[in-house]
Amino acid sequence: MKLLEQMVYVECFMIIMATLLVSMSYGHRAMINDVAEAPVIDNVGSPTNGLDSSWYDARATFYGDIHGGETQQGACGYGDLFKQGYGLETAALSTALFNEGYTCGACYQIMCVHDPQWCLPGTIKITATNFCPPDYSKTEGVWCNPPQKHFDLSLPMFLKIAQYKAGVVPVKYRRISCARTGGVKFETKGNPYFLMILPYNVGGAGDIKLMQVKGDKTGWITMQKNWGQNWTTGVNLTGQGISFRVTTSDGVTKDFNNVMPNNWGFGQTFDGKINF
């Protein structure tokens, strides 16, 4: 991709919750104290409507192996990222970007900049699926401490924009629309008195700011975000057909009607059939 020469300034599971933090591997280069200002960048990718799609400065490292080991599951609550459609195109976000899990599912376009020795041309597109935790015991090489904006990429994604030996590189990033295949999926967890739903494969903005549920015998019930992208209600909806109303961070709302039949069970996944 060609780079031009001007500048663009562009969030418990109460019964069984455990903090899911994947151990992170960081590069070994000396700390980069300042990320240089960015050149003007060609208008590539698919910006989201209603979201800020300006380019911003950050850094990137990698964790896991070439096959995506250590990147599965994580603090967003997703499981097998391959089965859920995210694959290797994922990243763990620093505190400044993770937003207590509300950013889970968001999509970003990232490019390596200002480091010709290590940067490779082109961009990558990733989904936020994990959290890169801060480490306050150190003062150097701690890229995920606030207020730093940082992407801990899967190794295959890092290698698309930088050489392995770089370890950590300055990047430019922006929000883009998530392109998904098929409908939004709804995975059931919990028990009759603590229904937990994990929505995934969410298109459009990708990240959810509000989720509601409705049974055959109820009105719309606002769910609570528990951890990551797991949403809960204490209302017993067993034996009822279930519908969902989902609002993404850009304000778009969609109704997913009659997603779950009245004989649904826990541990099942249902297809919402439509997407954003």
From Swiss-Prot:
InterPro entries: Expan_Lol_pI, Expansin, Expansin/allergen_DPBB_dom, Expansin_CBD, Expansin_CBD_sf, RlpA-like_DPBB, RlpA-like_sf. It comes from Arabidopsis thaliana. Residues 193-272 form the Expansin-like CBD domain. Gene3D superfamilies: Expansin, cellulose-binding-like domain (2.60.40.760), RlpA-like domain (2.40.40.10). One of its GO terms (cellular component) is extracellular region. Residues 1-27 form the signal peptide. It is a peripheral membrane protein. Keywords: Cell wall, Cell wall biogenesis/degradation, Membrane, Secreted, Signal. It comes from the Eukaryota. It is found in: Secreted, Cell wall; Membrane. The gene is EXPA25. Causes loosening and extension of plant cell walls by disrupting non-covalent bonding between cellulose microfibrils and matrix glucans. No enzymatic activity has been found. GO terms for biological process: anatomical structure morphogenesis; plant-type cell wall loosening. Residues 73-183 form the Expansin-like EG45 domain. This is Expansin-A25. Belongs to the expansin family. Expansin A subfamily. It holds the Pfam family Expansin_C. Its main location: secreted.
